[in-house]
């Protein structure tokens, strides 16, 4: 059994977390602990991570933050939902041995 992790539970991450939770074991992670469901996070913390969904702000430290999150959760694959500059996915892919996927966020 594995879990998915959504990093960044804001405008983008919260709906992704809600949707994925319907079919998969999914936990949210955020620097603001009050946004996280600590009970769920603790319950599944020892499960391996299948997908790490990135929904954090694209600051100048974005790549470094993604690498830290990858080290923390050790996922099999990373999916970036944040709006990022061209070349960021390739830059991260060159530094990681797992697939890195960019999934553009689209409004309705």
Residue ranges and their predicted role:
Residues 9, 30-31, 55-58, 81-83:
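Structural motif
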Residues 51, 60-108:
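Rossmann-like NAD(P)(H) cofactor-binding subdomain of soluble oxidoreductases
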């Amino acid at each position: 059994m594995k879990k998915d992790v959504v990093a960044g539970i804001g405008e983008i991450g919260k709906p992704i977390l809600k949707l994925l939770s319907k079919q998969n074991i999914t936990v949210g992670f955020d620097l603001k602990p009050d946004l996280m469901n600590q009970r769920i996070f603790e319950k599944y913390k020892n499960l391996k991570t299948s997908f790490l969904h990135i929904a954090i702000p694209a600051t100048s430290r974005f790549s470094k933050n993604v690498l830290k999150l990858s080290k923390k959760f050790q996922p099999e694959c990373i999916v970036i939902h944040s709006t990022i500059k061209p070349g960021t996915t390739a830059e991260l892919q060159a530094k990681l041995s797992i697939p890195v996927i960019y999934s553009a966020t689209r409004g309705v």
